[in-house]
Amino acid sequence: MGDRPEHIAGVEHVDLAGKHALVTGSTSGIGRETALALGRLGADVMVHGRDAAAGAAVVDELTAMGREATFQQADYASVDDVRGLAAAVQEWTDDLDVLCNNAGGLFRDGRLTDLGVEYTFHVNHLAPYLLTAELLETLADDARIVTTSSGAHRGVELDFEAIESVDSYSGFRAYQRSKLANVLFSTALAHRLDRTDRSISSNAFHPGAIPGSGFSRFLPGPLPRLFATLDRLPMTTTVAEGAATAVSLAASPRVDDVSGRYFADCEPKEPSAAARDRATQRRLWEQSADLLEIDEPLADGRQ
């Protein structure tokens, strides 16, 4: 049992009974491991993904633990589907305690979504931005928002023109930009939440390069070793180890008062200089709302 995420994170004795958690992208990989770990700690869990059969299998595992579990199918490239996911959460609970923004992917072919946004950026950043905005009033006052980023956010700056273009498309470069956006978003969200009277935290993390995952298969040449070195991590990570940081951020009392940070291997790390740039955080926050044609979330908490 020591290789389970909650044991690796040192939170196996934390009691989440009565808590409600949404883990997006939880039909496989680290999302699935995170959902099951939170269930073992006592939380009721909403599972999300595109594969209904895989979602039902995770729900079955959770209900076998005695947890309340449900599955919601949603395509993250569809604004309507993301709004439908938020509506399903609001029907499920009035107080969402944990929001794990985990769903995402790495895509070889360049294409635009119906919004005219590059597909990787839309799925990996705009969708969780919209979901979080839709759920702000549903989150418990001490909720934890955990966003899956990547060490791949290093070595790139956010090219705002590339957000709406697939000219000279590189799947890995698009992935890097989206993972940088995850850290920028998570940090900007933390700053805005800090200006409210609620105690909601927002943190991002790097799960590691997991052998066999889409990320590790796509990494060119020496990059897995480079990212591991920068975050002082092993070059490869098991799925359970990758999920451990998410579980720690969702459950550990050690991070009760921690927000706006980037983590790897359950420890805070310094993200790239581009990820720490406050002007870029502000611009991304505002432009994301414009692209989605929604009011700027938490506008009263501008940096």
Regions found by a protein language model. Give the residues of each.
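C-terminal helical subdomain
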Residues: 178, 204, 228-269, 278, ...
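C-terminal helix-and-tail extensions that cap enzymatic domains
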Residues: 259-262, 269-303
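A generic "alpha-helical surface" signal
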Residues: 53, 80, 240, 279-282
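A generic structural signal for secondary-structure junctions
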Residues: 165, 220-221, 254
